[in-house]
């Protein structure tokens, strides 16, 4: 939120705050448009593809929910007793917790993020995977027990022919293809998670943030 940014930058030099804003607003916009020139479409499901978010997201996300849980423990007994004032105080206290994890809350620069601060690492995992497939003819597969994904080349074939990649063959080899969520303009409003300018990876988070920003 803008309040979180103001709090974060209040003791910083003016030029440092300017550089951060410049990067968030102009740099991310330039990357988005560059994605279009390279053939990428909008991906409005990037903000719902939580399993493919960057590691930075999870560090900040878990810290955020630790603070929410601490507030819940503080107010829960009064709320259970029917104290409406306690519930309102709890809601207001939660709203003061900086939700900086939303900066990392999408797998794609081609998403339309609702939070003005966007994210600090704008080229997401879906963007990289799409470019590697389109220009390098590569997909990510899981081929060991570590949980890490590596790049494996498509089987050699004529690029002008029908896709000859066979997921069954990969499965038979003991490897697993890494999948990403994708949804573009024609599906907006058909899918609750294919939405422009939403913030959050779950229905609860998205709804709460829409209400907060109303």
Language-model segment annotations:
Residues 20-25, 29:
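Soluble non-cytosolic domains of exported or imported proteins
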Residues 1-17, 21, 46-214:
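Conserved catalytic/binding loops enriched for acidic/polar residues
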Residues 28-43:
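Active-site recognition of the HExxH zinc-binding catalytic motif
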